[in-house]
Amino acid sequence: MNLSIGTQPARGQFDGLAKIARYNWPQYVGGFVTIWVVTAWLWTSQAVHPQLRLAAWIGVFFVAWWCIASLVASHWIYDRSELYRWTWIPTFLPAPPNRWLNLHAGLDESSKVLLQLFPNSSGRTGDFYDAKEMSEPSIRRAREEQGESDAEPIDFRSFPFADETFDTVFLLFAAHEIRCVASREIFFQELHRVLARSGKILLVEHARDLANFAAFGPGFFHFMPAREWRRLADLTGLQIMKEQRMTPFVKVMLMEKKI
């Protein structure tokens, strides 16, 4: 993958869109088959009650809308926005990191970029994937496509790092993969433990909000509401320094360890 930094996107023109389609292809196939079957039934059947016919057409509309809108939104986010141009990261942080940790659940698209952005820093990458906690087929397909990784396998419940090891932790589209509330709380407690005094966490996530519902339909339940990240920060001794939208669908949060 091309991980260039700056004015050129870090992906090809449609790489992000293609990946989303590949990781979630059963949903798209099921959606388009449903549209075809229901539409054919409505056109060929004359005995359908008018109210049922209306409801079926409404259902077809929403399925078609979410199939198309989710792909358009994904293309916007992952291929056309500033997100994967990467230069926003140094400007969002108050200072360049010296010792950083990049955490993901098996799909690492940022560690090489971080090393380029911060050449004088010391960085480590951890893969916290847990097959029991993260059982969704899409993440399994993403990991299979990613192949072998140089990331260090870690248990998100107990990081293999000493207290206050890192001044910055990067969580880029990763934390939402921990689905259990109690597990997320343990995870954030570990983040707090390994952060140095006044250390920072850069969190990037979709939000479970109206914009993501409009684009992804019921799939927006895969995301966490922004208030969940605020709750976890408050619970574990972190404070939100800054929040920013990158496109209507993605929220960037900078958290700091309270002294």
In which residue ranges do the predicted regions lie?
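Class I SAM-dependent methyltransferase Rossmann-like catalytic core
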Residues: 14-33, 39-94
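Class I SAM-dependent methyltransferase SAM/SAH-binding core
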Residues: 99-102, 106-158
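A short acidic, Gly/Pro-enriched loop at the edge of an enzyme's catalytic core
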Residues: 156-169
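A short glycine-rich, Lys/Arg-flanked "PGG" loop and its adjoining helix->strand segment in the class I
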Residues: 184-197
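Conserved beta-strand signature within the Rossmann-like core of class I S-adenosyl-L-methionine
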Residues: 198-205
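Core SAM-dependent methyltransferase catalytic element
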Residues: 236-259
